[in-house]
Amino acid sequence: MDQWSDNKDAIGMLSESLKEKVVTNEIAPALKEVKNHKYNFETEILNTGNVWNNDSKNGESGSAFGLDKIFQSSDSGNIAEGLELDLGNIMLETHNLESPAWKHADYDGVAASVNDNNNDWKFFVFDEREIDSMLQLFVRDFRADKPALRLAPSKLFYLASRFAFFYMPKEKELGTVLLNAFLCEVNQVTQQHPNDMVLCVQWLANVSLLLFYLKKDNKLDDLTVDIQNRCSELMNSLYITICQDAMRRMNENLEEGMVKYTGIQGLEDILRSRSWNLLRRRPTNDASTSPRSTPSASPRSITKIIASTLHLLEVFYIHPLIRAQCIEQLFSWLGARLFNIVISNKKYLSRAAAMETRFNISSLEEWSQTNSPKLQKPFDYPDEDLKVDLISKLLSLVQLLQWLQCLYRLSEDEDPRALQETLESLDALNPRQIYTAAKLYRPDITETKVSKTFLKKLDAFHEEKLREKINSSDKGDVSYEFELLKDETVFSPLKLPTKAQLINAYSYIVSGNGFNEDRKIVFQPHVSNILIDKLEENGLSMERAELPTSVFEDELQRREWRPDQEVEELLST
């Protein structure tokens, strides 16, 4: 991550870059005209005509992505418990988006959310000596204590970068320095708090929105190619951090909740009948030995963490494509982790234990079926085979459990045809995994040990498949395809949204897609009065910012400069 520290020295030198400010009587009125010049940001810069439509059909509102449905959910308390969060800290109150307060941007309940001078600010004018203070206020110490502030940093630094690129001396490259500093600080803050999922999701949302602004700004798109690449890299890093945090939370209770938990009546005695330590005296209170006596370790505790993660991604308006990949990654990890737990522990390799684990896995399948509509991927994604299929991530685990439930009967029946058909149907398992499960199989109370003859048949099947693989493979070593355990550390590469998909989600002109009505308020780039108040409370003031004198190269250019003409030229396509 050395690239994120490249700008550390530059950030520290910003406060020393200017010793004095020159404010002329002629520049100040010009600045005022620039501030007050009116234009429609979405029309001039974010023109989004003829983009694709995804989430709604026949005029449906697509409210699944709206705040109303999210905030009115009856499971908010469960979500807080699943992630050990106080959801009050991220302001999950319900708002009526059709109310006059929201339509007039008075949704913070205190003051108008956009600056009084102009509802669509095109620049944020600042002094380069104040960059470090801006980073301190809106990155290092920033917490979104109001819903209106969740995406405020990306808006502030985007509008500030427009001023830096268009009005600051080009030789200083202040726009590039500013955005690099912003991304560098975000990376450092999230690395220092990898277990704070709210913080990481918040910055993933802001970096995503910044990437959208830069791609849609015709003037900045070509100037910020390297910045956009850094945004993509940081988004990938944050995506991994968020997934790893959710995995860590699930892993704490995964074995207790998904493998040991007994939800089927009558299986507890069978599971205990073949206990490892038969000489140890059992507790007199049978209830104390049952995982059912610990409600914190149950299949529901796992699905709550997944639901909580998805809920946070929705609350912070993470792009639907990224949301889907995040949940898919969690299911992929769950499938691999549970598979390894079962196959590497002999006490779980029994018919009764497999039945119980399979019953618990059904809670994951039920959750995926219920929530799949929330995870629809954009249909125009170039990969045609990119589909949301969470259940397939558990296929190897499910087939292992099926094999454990039927292998003893197959060994007793001695039917070669039935055995061959069964082995061929277990296409998600390799022969080594099939053989190991049978070899370590623990008979239930009514069963006997698996015969050696049956194991020899499985061993022959293993060797035959290995020879076929070697003969058909160009590479000599194919042993990696016959590994016993699944790789739990594999992360699928994050597929970032295309420009059209970003427009579909974040542009408030598009109808009926992405985040629906919320976009009309949430995604407009502006600097709210709340942010300006924070600046002034910390000694920064809009009145102290100024256009640099280098904008006017000589007296003639100074006399002929017209703000409206300048802005029109800058925003021309």
Swiss-Prot record:
Keyword Protein transport: no
Keywords: Cytoplasm, Golgi apparatus
Sequence intervals crossing the membrane: none
GO cellular component term, pick one: Golgi apparatus
Subcellular location: Cytoplasm; Golgi apparatus
Any one GO MF annotation of this record: GTPase binding
Keyword Repeat: no
Protein's name according to its UniProt entry: Dilute domain-containing protein SPAC25B8.08
Organism listed in the record: Schizosaccharomyces pombe (strain 972 / ATCC 24843) (Fission yeast)
High-level lineage: Eukaryota, Fungi, Dikarya, Ascomycota, Taphrinomycotina
